[in-house]
A protein has these predicted regions:
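Surface/interface-facing alpha-helical segments and adjacent flexible terminal/loop regions used
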Residues: 1-167
């Protein structure tokens, strides 16, 4: 009878699958070791927001078909940030802080939308390191990984992106 009960439970929304994939990519140790992103709440947020920005842009590239999944991805991001902030005890100013985090995601999306071969290093530096000094080899590692992620996302169908087949 488990299949009968499984049908009664709503399936995980596709947005949460894509968001879970983004979280899995952002948790990869290479960002914090070879990439030297600080392994702090802010550093982990920077990686997650950067990965989500690249996924959002890939969804956006599919035009109208990517609109609903893009909104759903953002909603999953907001719900997770809200839960994380509550867990950290930021209840008094939660709304303001979550709005700030969503604004940070939106600014990353805009920044990545305008990335060119000439400004990749600058965009990665701002997105992951917030203009902090970073060694050339460290920056090169992060640039390489983000270029690879962008290329992988671009090569997949919309369904595969939504299903997280890029993580």
């Amino acid at each position: 009878m488990p299949s009968l009960f499984a049908r009664l439970r709503p399936a995980s929304p596709p947005s949460s699958v894509a968001y879970d994939a983004a979280v899995n990519v952002a948790r990869q140790p290479h960002w914090y070791r070879a990439g030297a992103v600080p392994d702090t709440m802010d550093g982990r947020f920077a990686v997650l927001a950067t990965v989500c920005a690249l996924v959002a842009l890939r969804l956006e590239a599919d035009g109208e078909g990517g609109n609903a999944p893009g909104v759903a991805l953002t909603e999953a991001f907001i719900a997770d940030m809200d839960a994380q902030m509550r867990q950290e005890g930021f209840d008094a100013t939660l709304g303001k802080k979550v709005r700030h985090l969503v604004g940070s995601l939106a600014s990353r999306v805009d920044r990545w939308r305008g990335v060119t071969d000439a400004n990749w290093n600058e965009v990665v530096r701002r997105s992951l390191y917030r203009d902090q000094p970073v060694a050339d080899d460290t920056l090169a590692h992060s640039v390489d990984r983000l270029r690879g992620l962008r290329k992988k996302l671009a090569a997949l169908t919309l369904d595969k992106v939504i299903e997280g087949h890029w993580a």
